[in-house]
């Protein structure tokens, strides 16, 4: 049965916290009986991730990638449904070079010359759905995937990320923000005191809500004027606000891309889902900062994301970096209890909990994920997890 693709429907994609006007194309295929196979083909042009608005079918400029002249793709070869055959094919100009690697599985691959161009083809057959396990790593770290990129080195991606935001003026100072920075760092004597107060202010005052800036959205950090006026943005805009604040305080700071939840391979494909900041300390080393995760957290970088790859967009260019390991003693939990067991076997007492780092953040989360009126119920639920007979006295 050949489906009439003219019957497809174009809908606004569901959105939560990020409102960039994404669309989704949906089509009804009808009832499927055992043994039926869906055979479909998707054609892509230009670059992997795009927020295309306006333009006509002949407007080729819409397909120019942000990193002009470069192509990358990240292709999951795992499936959620039994799949007879999956084919991925990319056609590039003869003069372009492409590096690729297939991870965590096998496929049939080839490169052929077709009509004066290079055609790379990757085929996998008889694919069964990947079985998930409790608390397993991300599927990108465990299941078959293809990574490819025409960009030679990570340094090239780093230089591009630096230039595209500097050229746009993402971190240009504005008087009203400079006044706030001067107010925040007044009386702060050390560089870490200044970095901490600026990071926490941005984290607590720029809420996570993404509004599209139009052209350039998705890879360009909103400028400080927009962020400080709207007091909202996604991770890149929150990081951009912090970078501008740090620069107004006299620091050297830049944006960085990272991948929360899975590793980034050596192939310089844009496998990132999060934006953070780096600040150069007096020692000359760069320190990562994550204002998106700092609210209700005593840390300046979430230690839940240790040994995580990130790429700073610095003027000298950077290779892929790795976030540092945080020692266990930075995340202690200490419970001091004073209890009394009576003759009837009832244990009564009080205890004090002190914590640091991510342990502190986890305890705070009991109180920060709900209303203040729910605090007592939240504490009672913690006690009931220990014993169904426990009661919160005060």
Name every feature range the model reports, one short phrase each.
Residues 41-57, 65-216, 343-367:
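Secretory-pathway-linked proteins and extracytosolic
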Residues 22, 33, 83, 115-117, ...:
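Short, solvent-exposed loop/turn segments at the edges of secondary structure
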Residues 178-179, 214-225, 259-261:
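Short, conserved phosphate-binding/catalytic loop or strand-edge motifs used
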Residues 196-197, 202-203, 222-232, 238-248:
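Active-site-proximal cofactor/substrate-binding loop regions of enzyme domains
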Residues 23-28, 181-189, 224-232, 364-368:
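Second-shell loop/turn segments in exported
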Residues 236-326:
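Hydrophobic/aromatic-rich core segments of domains that either
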Residues 1-82, 121, 153, 327-394:
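Lumenal/extracellular ectodomains and adaptor appendage modules
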Residues 30, 125, 203, 238, ...:
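Generic beta-strand/beta-sheet core signal
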């Amino acid at each position: 049965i050949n489906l009439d693709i003219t019957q497809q429907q174009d809908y606004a994609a569901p959105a939560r916290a990020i409102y960039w006007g994404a669309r989704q194309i949906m089509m009804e295929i009808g009832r499927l009986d055992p043994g039926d196979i869906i055979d479909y083909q998707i054609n892509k042009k230009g670059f992997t991730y795009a927020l295309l608005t306006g333009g006509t079918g002949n407007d080729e400029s819409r397909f120019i990638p942000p990193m002009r002249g470069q192509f990358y793709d990240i292709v999951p070869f795992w499936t959620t449904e039994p799949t007879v055959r999956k084919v991925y094919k990319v056609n590039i100009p003869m003069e372009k070079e492409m590096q690729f690697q297939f991870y965590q599985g096998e496929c049939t691959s080839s490169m052929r010359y077709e009509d004066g161009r290079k055609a790379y083809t990757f085929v996998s057959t008889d694919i069964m759905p990947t079985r998930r396990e409790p608390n397993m790593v991300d599927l990108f770290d465990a299941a078959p995937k293809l990574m490819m990129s025409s960009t030679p080195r990570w340094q090239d991606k780093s230089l591009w990320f630096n230039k595209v935001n500097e050229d746009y003026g993402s971190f240009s100072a504005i008087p009203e923000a400079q006044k706030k920075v001067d107010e925040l760092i007044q009386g702060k004597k050390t560089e870490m005191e200044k970095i901490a107060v600026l990071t926490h202010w941005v984290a607590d005052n720029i809420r996570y809500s993404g509004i599209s800036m139009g052209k350039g959205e998705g890879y360009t950090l909103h400028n400080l004027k927009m962020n400080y006026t709207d007091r909202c943005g996604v991770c890149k805009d929150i990081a951009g606000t912090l970078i501008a604040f740090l620069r107004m305080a006299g620091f050297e700071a830049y944006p960085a891309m990272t991948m929360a939840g899975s590793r980034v391979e050596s192939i310089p494909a844009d496998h990132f889902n999060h934006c953070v900041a780096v600040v150069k300390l007096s020692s000359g080393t760069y320190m990562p900062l994550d204002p998106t995760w700092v609210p209700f957290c005593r840390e300046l970088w979430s230690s839940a994301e240790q040994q995580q790859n990130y790429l700073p967009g610095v003027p000298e260019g950077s290779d892929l970096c790795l976030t540092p390991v945080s020692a266990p003693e930075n995340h202690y939990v200490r419970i001091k209890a004073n209890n009394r067991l009576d003759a009837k076997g009832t244990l009564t007492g009080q205890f004090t909990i002190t914590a640091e780092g991510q342990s502190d953040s986890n305890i705070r989360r009991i109180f920060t994920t709900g209303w203040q009126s729910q605090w007592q119920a939240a504490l009672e639920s913690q006690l009931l997890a220990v014993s169904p007979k426990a009661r919160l006295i005060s």
